[in-house]
């Protein structure tokens, strides 16, 4: 009878320890990660473009920033790029900047993509995916609309039409009431 009781107590203690360990791991992986949402400060980052020029998000304060995460293999991303290029021609002079963050690909692959799509805006490389993780991005494409004060005013997941891109750039241009 004593052996059964000891076994029962040991099993109970083991279950409590396993639950505590599981809870600790869950908190470390998921609960500690703050999701970037509307109204949040946009996390600063420094990344290089395909020519090695450093771009820091905080240097763009005072401008609206259309922060787009993408990949060369992503079909919806390919669809958006010509629309983004068209709208950039119009909105750049109004204080809106596009920063397209390529996720985990080589300089050569990104450079070739840029040439074939006639990209006219800054494209930076997040080879180690640190910025992707900081912004908690999933899936691609995901776009963060950042107002001139550095606040995220909208997060858009999935493909955008040219009309949507136009409206979003209007939303974040300096002088507009964007959150």
UniProtKB/Swiss-Prot annotation:
One of its GO terms (biological process) is cytochrome complex assembly. SUPFAM superfamilies: Thioredoxin-like. Pathway: Protein modification; cytochrome c assembly. Pfam families: AhpC-TSA (PF00578). Its main location: membrane. Keywords: Cell membrane, Cytochrome c-type biogenesis, Disulfide bond, Membrane, Oxidoreductase, Redox-active center, Signal-anchor, Transmembrane, Transmembrane helix. It is a single-pass type II membrane protein. HAMAP family: ResA. NCBIfam families: PRK03147.1 (NF002854). This is Thiol-disulfide oxidoreductase ResA. It comes from Bacillus subtilis (strain 168).
């Amino acid at each position: 009878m004593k052996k059964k009781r000891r076994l029962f107590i040991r099993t109970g203690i083991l279950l409590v320890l396993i639950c505590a360990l599981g809870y600790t791991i869950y908190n470390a992986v998921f609960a500690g990660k703050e999701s970037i949402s509307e109204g949040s400060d946009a996390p600063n980052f420094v990344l290089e473009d395909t020519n090695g020029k450093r771009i820091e998000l905080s240097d763009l304060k005072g401008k609206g920033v259309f922060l787009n995460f993408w990949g060369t293999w992503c079909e919806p991303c390919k669809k958006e790029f010509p629309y983004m290029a068209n709208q950039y021609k119009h909105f750049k002079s109004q204080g809106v900047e596009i920063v397209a963050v390529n996720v985990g690909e080589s300089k050569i692959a990104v450079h070739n993509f840029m040439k074939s799509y006639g990209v006219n805006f800054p494209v930076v490389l997040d080879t180690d995916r640190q910025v992707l993780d900081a912004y908690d991005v999933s899936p691609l494409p995901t776009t963060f609309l950042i107002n001139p004060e550095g606040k995220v005013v909208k997060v858009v997941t999935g493909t955008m039409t040219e009309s949507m891109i136009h409206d979003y750039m209007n939303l974040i241009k300096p002088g507009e009431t964007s959150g």
